[in-house]
Swiss-Prot record:
Keywords tagged on the record: Electron transport, Flavoprotein, FMN, Membrane, Nitrogen fixation, Phosphoprotein, Translocase, Transmembrane, Transmembrane helix, Transport
Keyword set includes Disulfide bond: no
Similarity comment: family membership: Belongs to the RnfG family.
Record's keyword annotation contains Translocase: yes
UniProt-recorded name of the protein: Ion-translocating oxidoreductase complex subunit G
Enzymatic class: translocase
Pfam families: FMN_bind
UniProt-listed InterPro entries: FMN-bd (IPR007329), Ion_transpt_RnfG/RsxG (IPR010209)
Subunit structure, interactors included: The complex is composed of six subunits: RnfA, RnfB, RnfC, RnfD, RnfE and RnfG.
Annotated source species: Cereibacter sphaeroides (strain ATCC 17023 / DSM 158 / JCM 6121 / CCUG 31486 / LMG 2827 / NBRC 12203 / NCIMB 8253 / ATH 2.4.1.)
Annotated TM spans: 25-45
A biological process from GO: electron transport chain
GO molecular function: electron transfer activity; FMN binding
Amino acid sequence: MTDDTAAPPPRGPARDWKSSPLVSGLLLGLFSLVSALMLALASDATRGPIAARSAEDLLASLAQVLPETLHDNDPTADIRTLSDADEGAVRVYVAARGGAVTAVTFELTGYGYGGAIRVLMAVAADGTILGARVLSHTETPGLGDKIEIGKDDWIEGFAGRSLTDPGPAGWKVRRDGGVFDQFSGATITPRAVVGTIHRGLTLFDRHRAELLAPLPPRS
């Protein structure tokens, strides 16, 4: 005879639903989704201001090397991309008056003592340099940084130069037999800039017909 009043067998400990692997996975997925959405919203919020700042910086840089009197168009809107065997793809900002190209501006990179040196240069239709500026570099402060217009006027010495002025042998620093000054204690840096600007002139010369082709009329 069974005793109906006997206690039921003991049960295992109650399982907390929060510790379930399925719930943990769902919570982790939800957290990741919320984080991704927040990052996307933050990216969208900053993309506009960053793009606007980049456009302002570009216009300011162009204004330093490209006289406003040479164009009635917006060079940042009239862009040609060169495909060059030596330099690769080069983005070119075209200045024009009445559709006739008066000058082009582009950026090339050279390598100095501290690393990459980004140089922006404007070249007139006749092949003479209108101006050049160093956009960024990591050269030694107090020595190589004289390539900056804010530190020295050395970079302004390229205005008016061309492939024939001073000629192939002259496109070097004085220590190498050329006409351009080097800096005391720093020869590698100016040598790199001179070489980069000379490369820019030869690039222009190779693609002269393409670069100086009239702009299509605006609709």
